Amino acid sequence: MDSNTIINQTPILALEQLTYSYHTLSGETKALENISFKISPGEFVAIVGPSGCGKSTLLNIIAGQITDYTGNIKFHDTPMRILQSHSADLHIGYMLQHDHLFDWRTIYKNVCLGLEIKNLMTDENIDYVLSLLEKYGLYDFKDKKPSQLSGGMRQRAALIRTLALNPELLLLDEPFSALDYQTRLQVSGDIGNIIRENKKTAILVTHNLSEAISLADKIIVLTQRPATIKRIVDISLTITDNSPLGYRTAPEFNEYFNEIWEDLCDEN
């Protein structure tokens, strides 16, 4: 995304001094401390940090699954707590490490599940789902069961299920980590393209730094617990090779990688 476009847009999401602690048998543990950042519409943000630093916890808070935090989260300039207290539909989609497709349902029935639950199976929405299946190579498999598809195809189906509800913000929690290396390269690129083609805003949590650099407009680097923001890096790659590893030939790639890698090593 063009940096000037990002600067001039009102944030879709803003975190202000977000802090979160949880209780254990040994007492209170602070997981996140004074986390502040903004995300503009259409921006793809990756969050990286040491294992166990609280990356997934942060996504759970943004998704509304954890509410006992301090600080503020704003969605389109409205505090998230106000929206949640009025049971407002936040239009946030969540994609996890595992696809969570049900094998007793066909691919088509799986991707329509959210629409069924929300009673949104209109002709318009059904046409939209079918167009997504067609566009991303799953239309001919729509009557198959998930067990009949490859891991990469199942992850594409899981993303289409999320897109079917037309969310404004996508939260991606290690969605490629269960895939083998070759499939992961292909699917991460495919899903990155799908998100951009559909003009979605996305936050990706990943342990794979190369993946983060290849997909993101900016990378948020977290410290060890209690996690704070160590650095926010704007990413801009000059890519001339469209192969799955083409981003590594970008002249800026090694500079970004080494810079962020040093930050991560300092935390281990």
Regions found by a protein language model. Give the residues of each.
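The feature captures the beta-strand-to-loop junction immediately N-terminal to the Walker
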Residues: 48-50
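Helix-to-loop junction immediately C-terminal to a conserved catalytic motif
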Residues: 63
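ABC ATPase NBD Q-loop/coupling interface
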Residues: 72-90, 122, 238
